[in-house]
């Protein structure tokens, strides 16, 4: 893996099963139990995402990372259908593409990026 790239992101969750199902249904991520209230998605291409069990989450306390995707509108639709909410609709980034933000059922903000 190249230096200075994000290797791992961790998302707090008050309900691991709900979060696992949400991210699977919205983004197709497959999480595996990693022990001690932790689930891990690893595509073996440099991206790992962990779901960490917590009792409470303060709104806005999560790290925002953006995911490259081919169709923002489709992902925002899936997020809403699976208990999430749109935090920012598809927004133009001049000469680059678009971005949007959604909240998962715990209120974590996830960013989306679509190249033009």
Model-inferred region functions:
Residues 34, 53-54, 114-116:
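Acetyl-CoA-dependent GNAT
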Residues 2, 11, 76-77, 82-116:
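Vicinal oxygen chelate
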Residues 7-48:
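Core segments of cupin and vicinal oxygen chelate
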Residues 30, 50, 86-89:
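A short linear hydrophobic-aromatic micro-motif
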Residues 16, 42-48, 52-63, 68, ...:
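Conserved, structured core segments of small domains
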Residues 1-20, 63-65, 115-116:
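N-terminal beta-strand motif that seeds the catalytic metal site of vicinal oxygen chelate
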């Amino acid at each position: 893996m190249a230096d200075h790239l994000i290797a791992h992101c961790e998302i707090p969750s008050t309900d691991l099963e709900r979060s696992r199902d949400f991210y699977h249904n919205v983004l197709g991520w497959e999480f595996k139990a990693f022990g001690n209230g932790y689930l891990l998605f690893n595509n073996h291409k440099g991206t790992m995402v962990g779901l960490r069990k917590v009792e409470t989450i303060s709104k806005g306390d999560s790290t925002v990372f953006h995911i490259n995707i081919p169709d923002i509108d489709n992902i925002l639709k899936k997020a809403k259908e699976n208990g999430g909410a749109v935090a920012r609709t598809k927004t133009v980034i001049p000469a680059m593409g678009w971005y949007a933000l959604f909240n998962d059922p715990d209120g974590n903000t996830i960013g989306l990026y679509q190249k033009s």
